[in-house]
């Protein structure tokens, strides 16, 4: 029976994700491989995350600040920027960046290994390819996605504060007070939601990228 390619990819992703998560719960994790993948998905993609965070914070802040300043409520700029970034922009843009920088590298690595029959060789050596190749990469994405998301949020707020002060004469103390305790301010639930979203995005992205091992 013929099955569409997208259906095969979906089934492959579900299978590989389930197997990898099973190995994680059993504690079958190579620390050396995990550390190597953390270096690739962390410091290896840090620069692009920081640059995009600065750009996003600048653009978002200029749009928000211009409207709020014209209405005479420039003291709320920081809070609106923080909430908008934490709830939607930071996890979404971070996931997009991690997809382009890290997930594509994972897919290319496993695709090359499959074409050159390295995965079959690993299996013949009685090493489980899911445990050896997938688990470290999956965990690295799950661990580094929220960390990168927090860095993205921090940089975007810092960038927004600088431009608010330069263009709209908003004192830094007013900006950061708005972030912490304004009418619209950043709360622990916003941060928790952002972390959960980034973890889920990291899990989904890595499973899809690593499903090539079964295709």
Where are the predicted features?
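Short, membrane-interfacial amphipathic segments enriched in basic
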Residues: 2-34
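Active-site cofactor/substrate anionic-group-binding motifs, chiefly glycine-
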Residues: 41-93, 97
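Selective transmembrane-helix segments that form parts of the transport pathway or gating/packing helices
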Residues: 42, 46, 50, 89, ...
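Short cytoplasmic-facing helical segments at TM-TM junctions of multi-pass membrane proteins
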Residues: 110-135
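Hydrophobic alpha-helical segments embedded in or immediately adjacent to the lipid bilayer
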Residues: 134-178, 197
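Hydrophobic alpha-helical transmembrane segments of polytopic membrane proteins
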Residues: 176-211
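Conserved small/polar residues in nucleotide/adenosyl-binding loops
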Residues: 214-215
């Amino acid at each position: 029976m013929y099955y569409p390619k997208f259906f095969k990819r979906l089934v492959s992703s579900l299978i590989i994700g389930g197997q990898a998560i099973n190995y994680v719960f059993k504690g079958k994790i190579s620390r050396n491989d995990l550390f190597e993948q953390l270096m690739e998905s962390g410091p290896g993609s840090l620069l692009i995350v920081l640059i995009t965070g600065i750009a996003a914070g600048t653009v978002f802040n200029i749009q928000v600040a211009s409207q709020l300043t014209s209405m005479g409520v420039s003291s709320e700029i920081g809070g609106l920027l923080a909430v908008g970034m934490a709830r939607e922009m930071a996890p979404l843009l971070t996931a997009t960046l991690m997809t382009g920088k890290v997930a594509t590298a994972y897919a290319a690595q496993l695709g090359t290994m499959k074409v050159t029959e390295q995965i079959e060789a690993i299996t013949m050596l009685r090493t489980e390819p899911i445990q050896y190749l997938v688990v470290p990469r999956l965990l690295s994405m799950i661990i580094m996605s929220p960390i990168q998301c927090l860095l993205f949020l921090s940089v975007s707020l810092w960038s927004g504060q600088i431009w608010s002060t330069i263009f709209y004469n908003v004192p830094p103390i007013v900006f950061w007070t708005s972030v912490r305790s304004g009418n619209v301010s950043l709360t622990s639930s916003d941060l928790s939601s952002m972390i959960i979203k980034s973890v889920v995005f990291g899990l989904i992205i890595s499973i899809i990228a690593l499903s090539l091992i079964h295709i």
